[in-house]
Amino acid sequence: MNPHATPVLVLSLALGTTITISSNHWVLAWTGLEINTLAIIPLISKSHHPRAVEAATKYFLTQAAASALVLFSSMTNAWATGQWDITQLNHPTSCLLLTAAIAIKLGLVPFHFWFPEVLQGSPLMTALLLSTLMKFPPLTLLLMTSKSLNPALLTTMALASAALGGWMGLNQTQTRKILAFSSISHLGWIAIILVYSPKLALLTFYLYAIMTSAVFMALNKIKALNLSMVLTSWTKTPVLNATLMLVLLSLAGLPPLTGFMPKWLIIQELTKQEMTPAAMAIAMLSLLSLFFYLRLAYHSTITLPPNSSNHMKQWYTSKPPSTPTAILASLSILLLPLSPMIHAIV
């Protein structure tokens, strides 16, 4: 791909995201979603590998179907109520259609099948965009219409996402697939609290985006596409691998790391809303994903692969870790003491 095309595509992604999150009219929001879809497809398929082309095709087909559903739900609402305002989504059928459309765009269960396959066929930095930036516009639409959505439906989808995201990630050896199922599991936490506390859902997404970005950037630095490549990277980049372990434990939600904050606040809010069984269920289901985070963390720091031949060990990394990776990793590990202030600001 032409090197000058990448900045144009990234700017288009920023433009599409900005249009969607700042719009009040359904057609403008839909336009932003379409700009995003068209801008990310060349980034997915830029390696010209058959798997990358397949991933781009799958992504295009699912996103096109979801965008058509968004447009159809807004037209149904406009037909019934005469309103094109995003916050005035009052028709029950429109709410159901929009929930399905956004679930497809986000990769929530039961519309999750495309997401791990697309991430597996994408380069690591494109997978980072798909897991974070590309989820922000659809999530914004859900937040703007949260008062009209069905809480029971969202809770069911959230619990199913947390269960399936943890369950399907257990036997994976590819790092991108592990992070795809991690994303599905975290979306479950966001969806379960969305109706009751939209601001807390947004805070959870922000923290998830910070932690996932740190993991993807670390994996990109050590060029680790599967667990065996993570194993061999310890002698080359020991500091980065140790940091990766801490960020993965934070992503798992272990105290005293940043990732514990959203889980703690969500369980607290669900208990206030008298949804203790749902809080207990999603807390127990997070133990499934904890297992594969621990396995990835164990591979990144503790074990070295057996090797019978003599070879020179590389004890020092040739390049220092980049500043963005260091900043994101620090935020992923150290923000828990600031949680009262962060919760008050958000």
Swiss-Prot record:
GO terms for cellular component: mitochondrial inner membrane. Its main location: mitochondrion. This is NADH-ubiquinone oxidoreductase chain 2. GO terms for molecular function: NADH dehydrogenase (ubiquinone) activity. Core subunit of the mitochondrial membrane respiratory chain NADH dehydrogenase (Complex I) that is believed to belong to the minimal assembly required for catalysis. Complex I functions in the transfer of electrons from NADH to the respiratory chain. The immediate electron acceptor for the enzyme is believed to be ubiquinone. Its EC number is 7.1.1.2. It catalyses: a ubiquinone + NADH + 5 H(+)(in) = a ubiquinol + NAD(+) + 4 H(+)(out). It is found in: Mitochondrion inner membrane. The chain crosses the membrane at residues 1-21, 25-45, 60-80, 95-115, 124-144, 149-169, 178-195, 200-219, 242-262, 274-294, 326-346. The keyword Transferase does not apply. Coiled coil: none annotated. InterPro entries: Complex_I_Subunit_2 (IPR050175), NADH_DH_su2_C (IPR010933), NADH_UbQ_OxRdtase_chain2 (IPR003917), ND/Mrp_TM (IPR001750). The lineage of its organism: Eukaryota, Metazoa, Chordata, Craniata, Vertebrata. Keywords: Electron transport, Membrane, Mitochondrion, Mitochondrion inner membrane, NAD, Respiratory chain, Translocase, Transmembrane, Transmembrane helix, Transport, Ubiquinone. The gene is MT-ND2. One of its GO terms (biological process) is mitochondrial electron transport, NADH to ubiquinone.
